[in-house]
Amino acid sequence: MMGKLGVVLFICLVLFPLETLQLEGGQQADRHVDQLEGNPNRETRTIEVRCTTMNCLKGHCGCSPDCGSC
């Protein structure tokens, strides 16, 4: 009887919380992806930052003439 109780307690107190922690981690990652997909300006902002780097100041940035820094 005590052995069965020990197994049940082990499952409830150790294995079940470990499984729920893994699910929460996956949900956090999905939420982060949703935030990135919902923000179309993030990609545009990255392109603008690349256009204003030192390569642009040297004259060989490879971006469009509309860059402003070229």
Swiss-Prot record:
The keyword Signal applies. Keywords: Disulfide bond, Neurotoxin, Secreted, Signal, Toxin. Coiled coil: none annotated. Its main location: secreted. Residues 21-50 form a propeptide. The keyword Transferase does not apply. Residues 1-20 form the signal peptide. One of its GO terms (cellular component) is extracellular region. It comes from the Eukaryota. Disulfide bonds join 51-63, 56-67, 61-70. It holds the Pfam family Conotoxin. It is found in: Secreted. Expressed by the venom duct. GO terms for molecular function: ion channel inhibitor activity; toxin activity. InterPro entries: Conotoxin. Belongs to the conotoxin M superfamily. The cysteine framework is IX (C-C-C-C-C-C). This is Conotoxin Cl9.1. It comes from Californiconus californicus (California cone).
